[in-house]
Curated annotation (Swiss-Prot):
The gene is dapE. This is Succinyl-diaminopimelate desuccinylase. The active site is at D69, E134 (proton acceptor). Optimum pH is 7.0 in the presence of Zn(2+). The maximal velocities are independent of pH in the alkaline region but decrease below pH 7.0. SUPFAM superfamilies: Bacterial exopeptidase dimerisation domain, Zn-dependent exopeptidases. Pfam families: M20_dimer, Peptidase_M20. Competitively inhibited by L,L-DAP, D,L-DAP, 2-carboxyethylphosphonic acid (CEPA) and 5-mercaptopentanoic acid (MSPA). Succinate is a poor inhibitor. It comes from Haemophilus influenzae (strain ATCC 51907 / DSM 11121 / KW20 / Rd).
């Protein structure tokens, strides 16, 4: 299985699919799956290409979810080999997307192929949901596919997202949930004027100081057994004309919260508004909710992937919910159990992104055993 996974991963990496471009990756996948009897459905939205492929017509529906798009390479001169050449050096496959996530995407596809070849009349349905818009806006990708499926009452029972979840060793971590993410774009109004005549102006930076202190030190919650505490970070701040003798008319502050299930986005909005009113600030605020928190509690999917990892590499993974958001947040809206498992994430988005060839082979075996555990038990 390892050779098949690595070969497909190389084919995908060699296509420079900077988000939201697919560059033919999904066509390669569709042609392979179609030969095995998968039903292929294309769901393009704007400049994003999405693929929904399935084999079988009954429940449970087991979906593999992934993305073909990658982030930009940065300075290619800093790479030890060209970022889209997919070279193998000392047992490591190098290239943009090797770990995030063309390697695990290849492993999921080969695992599905091998299972269907051996079990052409399997029970349930095996599906793949693949998008070219995960790394950028994520507005035309998985969410649109999910909305389309829900509109026609299609279900996903279990979903494996191939994001690189492993931390120090393959299989040491799986993600059984993710925190929510909400961004506030806050504009605090003042009155522009000359710095020598502050009584004729109103400095929004000065007026916002105590508010910012409260905002950044407020304890939203203490987390719970599944999630770490909610955290807030200021990401961007700007005011002024660039001149040293002008009091600015407006202060812009952008902040993001990664929040757990102890609070809701509405509670966050209400509390921030209360803080702003308390400090008598003139403001307007625009909110962007990227995703609500989701959690897959111990059950059949988590048991199946845990058992597959234990059987393949002899370690028991830890289920965690930390880190950023993923497309799992959209699939969870369908009521599916969602778990993320993939290779090490230590080089993702970096120069010289790479993944162990041995680990890719193991990923394929683990995904295959997960299918066996879910469909043959």
């Amino acid at each position: 299985m390892k050779e098949k996974v690595v070969s497909l991963a190389q084919d995908l990496i060699r296509r420079p699919s900077i988000s939201p471009n697919d560059e033919g990756c999904q066509q390669i996948i569709a042609e392979r799956l179609e030969k095995l009897g998968f039903q292929i459905e294309w769901m393009p939205f704007n400049d994003t290409l999405n693929l929904w492929a399935k084999h079988g017509t009954s429940e449970p529906v087991i979906a593999f979810a992934g993305h073909t798009d990658v982030v930009p390479t940065g300075d290619e001169n800093q790479w030890s080999s060209p970022p889209f050449s997919a070279e193998i050096i000392d047992g490591m496959l190098y290239g943009r997307g090797a770990a995030d996530m063309k390697g695990s995407l290849a492993a999921m596809i080969v695992a599905a192929e091998e299972y269907v070849k051996a079990n052409p009349n399997h029970k349930g349905t095996i599906a793949l949901l693949i998008t070219s818009d995960e790394e950028a806006t994520a507005k035309d990708g998985t969410i649109h596919v999910v909305e389309t499926l829900m509109a026609r009452d299609e279900k996903i029972t279990y979903c494996m997202v191939g994001e690189p979840s492993s931390a120090k060793n393959l299989g040491d971590v799986v993600k059984n949930g993710r925190r929510g993410s909400i961004t506030g774009n806050l504009y605090i109004q003042g009155i522009q004027g000359h710095v020598a005549y502050p009584h004729l102006a109103e400095n929004p930076i000065h007026k916002a100081a105590l508010f910012l202190q409260e905002l950044t030190t407020y304890q939203w919650d203490k987390g719970n057994e599944f999630f770490p505490p909610t955290s807030l970070q200021i990401a961007n701040i700007h005011a002024g004309t660039g001149s040293n003798n002008v009091i600015p008319a407006e202060l812009y502050i952008q902040f993001n919260l990664r929040y757990c299930t102890e609070v809701t986005d509405e509670i966050i909005k209400q509390k921030v508004a209360e803080m702003l009113e308390k400090h008598n600030l003139k403001y307007r605020i625009e909110w962007n909710l990227s995703g609500k928190p989701f959690l897959t509690k111990p059950g059949k999917l988590l048991d199946s992937i845990t058992s597959a990892i234990e059987e393949t590499i002899g370690i028991t993974p830890k289920a965690e919910t930390g880190g950023g958001t993923s497309d799992g947040r959209f699939i969870a809206l369908m009521g599916a159990e969602v778990v993320e498992f993939g290779p090490l994430n230590s080089t993702i988005h970096k120069v010289n992104e790479c993944v162990s060839v041995e680990d890719l082979g193991k990923c394929g075996e683990i995904y295959h055993k997960m299918l066996v555990n879910l469909l043959d038990s």
